[in-house]
A protein has these predicted regions:
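Amphipathic alpha-helical packing segments from all-alpha helical-bundle domains
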Residues: 52, 82-91, 101-126, 137, ...
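Short, charged helix-capping/linker segments at alpha-helix termini
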Residues: 10-11, 127-135
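Short, basic, alpha-helical segments at the C-terminal edge of helix-turn-helix-like DNA-binding modules
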Residues: 44-50
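C-terminal peripheral helix-coil segments that are non-catalytic and often amphipathic
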Residues: 112-124, 145, 151-188
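Helix-turn-helix
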Residues: 2-41
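Hydrophobic alpha-helical connector segments
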Residues: 41, 55-86, 135-142, 184
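Secondary-structure edge/capping motif, primarily at the C-terminal ends of alpha-helices
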Residues: 61, 94-98, 153-157
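Short helix-capping/turn signature of helix-turn-helix
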Residues: 32, 78, 92-99
Length: 188
C-alpha cells in the first residue's frame, strides 16, 4: 500500500516494491506473481477490511435504525479506515475502476452493500419519524457527505479531524430527521 500511496497505481512496480521492502525482485515475483495480482489482492484486502469494519459497527450498535446509522457513520471515520494512506489508495483504485472490471466489481459490490444498508436504515427511520428528505435522497446525501469528507481528509488542510467529520455528518442526519434527539458525538 505504501507504494500505491506514494507513487500511484501506474508507477507502482514489483521492482519498486522489492526495493521498498528490501528483498529481491525475484522473491516479490515468486510470492505476488504479477503487478495485476498484487493490485487486485491489495484492493480485496482494503475492501474486506472496510466491510468487516462497518459490519462489526452494526453488530455492536443498539438495534434501533437511528443508532445503527450513526454507527455506520462513525465506522466510516475510524482511524484504521480513515487515514491519509488508505484513503489515497482507495482513490487510486476508484480512479481506475471504470477501465478495470476487476476493480469495479470489488469496489462496486462493497459500495452497493454499504449503500443498501444505509438506504434500509433511512427507510426504517423515515417510516417511524418525521423526515425532511425521502429515504433515497437522505441515504445518497449521507453517503455523498462521507465520500466528500474522505476527499477533504486526503486533500484538505492537515488540521481536519475525524471528530469534525463525524459531527458534520451527524448534524446533516439530525437536520434530515429533526424529531430524533442527537446522542453524544464520538471523539475518534
Amino acid at each position: 500500500m505504501d507504494c500505491i500511496d506514494k507513487l500511484g497505481l501506474s508507477q507502482t512496480t514489483l521492482a519498486r516494491i522489492a526495493e521498498r521492502v528490501g528483498i529481491s525482485q525475484g522473491n516479490v515475483v515468486f510470492h505476488l506473481h504479477s503487478k495485476k495480482a498484487l493490485l487486485a489482492q491489495t484492493l480485496r484486502h482494503l475492501n474486506d477490511e472496510y466491510r468487516c469494519n462497518w459490519i462489526a459497527a452494526l453488530a455492536a450498535a443498539p438495534p434501533d435504525a437511528h443508532s445503527q446509522l450513526r454507527a455506520l457513520i462513525e465506522a466510516s471515520f475510524t482511524p484504521k479506515i480513515c487515514n491519509r494512506r488508505k484513503i489515497s489508495v482507495w482513490f487510486a483504485f476508484w480512479g481506475e475502476s471504470r477501465s478495470r472490471p476487476t476493480y469495479m466489481r470489488v469496489c462496486g459490490d462493497n459500495d452497493k452493500a454499504f449503500s443498501d444498508q444505509v438506504l434500509a436504515l433511512c427507510q426504517t427511520i423515515e417510516a417511524r419519524s418525521t423526515a425532511r428528505l425521502k429515504a433515497e435522497t437522505a441515504a445518497l446525501s449521507l453517503e455523498g457527505m462521507i465520500d466528500g469528507l474522505w476527499q477533504n481528509f486526503l486533500l484538505g488542510s492537515s488540521g481536519f479531524k475525524r471528530a469534525q467529520a463525524i459531527k458534520a455528518v451527524f448534524e446533516l442526519m439530525d437536520s434530515i430527521y429533526p424529531d430524533r434527539k442527537p446522542e453524544s458525538v464520538a471523539t475518534i
